[in-house]
């Protein structure tokens, strides 16, 4: 209320909502949705295995014992259960499926299976008519992969970053860099937005788990 922000992206963390396989607890997110509805706040729900916050992939412990095929079925079940539970809320304006799925150089995640990712997109589309948001790195991607499957393309914008090998570095990129990339793929999507905007440089502790707080 103090900040006056009226649009939030909400990551749904798998390890919080399905601690036991097949048993979902939506209590935390039901509260967020209810508060948003009461305050006329719009939400983008980020769903899937890989969602914002280091280490990006947040799976419950029981997933470790699954085969790859079983794991994919569990992810699809997570998506279906999430959309079915929340799609009645008018506060949610679109679904984000995974987070920067084509970015292989950040996060502790397995390699992307592009065919399976398209299955995820298709499943969410079949469950609800809201737009699908796909996110890409603003600096480390041409945005074409995300634009090919998205309704809304969200891009990150970082200026000063930390690398454990070379320390701090700054991207020598102007606003024209992002604008031209957006113009290049504009006909492929309904809109291009900034989904992450850096507020301050990250430091070495970005590679550590920060906990629930």
Predicted region positions:
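The substrate-binding groove and active-site-proximal loops of carbohydrate-active enzymes
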Residues: 13-26, 60-74, 98-112, 160-176, ...
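Short, acidic/polar
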Residues: 1-2, 75-83, 136-146, 212-213
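Hydrophobic faces of well-ordered beta-strands that scaffold small-molecule active sites
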Residues: 8-10, 43-47, 93-97, 132-134, ...
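A structural motif corresponding to the C-terminal end of an alpha-helix
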Residues: 3, 35-42, 81-93, 120-130, ...
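Solvent-exposed loop/turn segments at secondary-structure junctions
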Residues: 13-17, 49-53, 99-104, 138-141, ...
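Aromatic-lined substrate-binding rim segments of carbohydrate-active enzymes
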Residues: 1-61, 109-133, 148, 171-173
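Glycoside hydrolase catalytic-domain groove-lining segments
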Residues: 114, 119, 126-206
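Active-site groove signature of glycoside hydrolases
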Residues: 49-57, 75-110
């Amino acid at each position: 209320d103090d900040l006056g922000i009226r649009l939030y992206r909400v990551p749904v963390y798998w390890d919080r909502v399905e601690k036991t396989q097949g048993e979902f607890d939506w209590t935390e997110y039901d509260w967020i949705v209810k508060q948003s509805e009461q305050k006329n706040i719009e939400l983008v729900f980020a769903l899937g295995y890989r969602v914002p916050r280091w280490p990006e992939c947040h799976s419950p412990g029981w997933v470790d014992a699954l085969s790859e095929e079983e794991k994919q079925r569990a992810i699809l079940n997570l998506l279906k259960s999430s959309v079915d539970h929340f799609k009645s809320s008018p506060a949610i304006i679109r679904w984000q499926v995974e987070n920067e799925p084509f970015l292989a150089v950040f996060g502790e995640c397995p390699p992307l299976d592009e065919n399976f990712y398209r299955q995820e997109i298709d499943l969410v589309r079949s469950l609800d008519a809201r737009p699908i948001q796909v996110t890409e790195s603003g600096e480390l991607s041409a945005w074409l992969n995300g634009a090919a499957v998205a309704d809304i393309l969200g891009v990150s914008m970082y200026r000063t970053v930390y690398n454990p090998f070379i320390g701090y570095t700054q991207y020598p990129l102007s606003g024209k860099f992002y604008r031209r990339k957006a113009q290049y793929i504009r006909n492929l999507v309904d809109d291009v937005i900034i989904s992450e905007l850096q507020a301050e440089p990250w430091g070495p502790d970005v590679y550590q788990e920060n906990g629930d707080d």
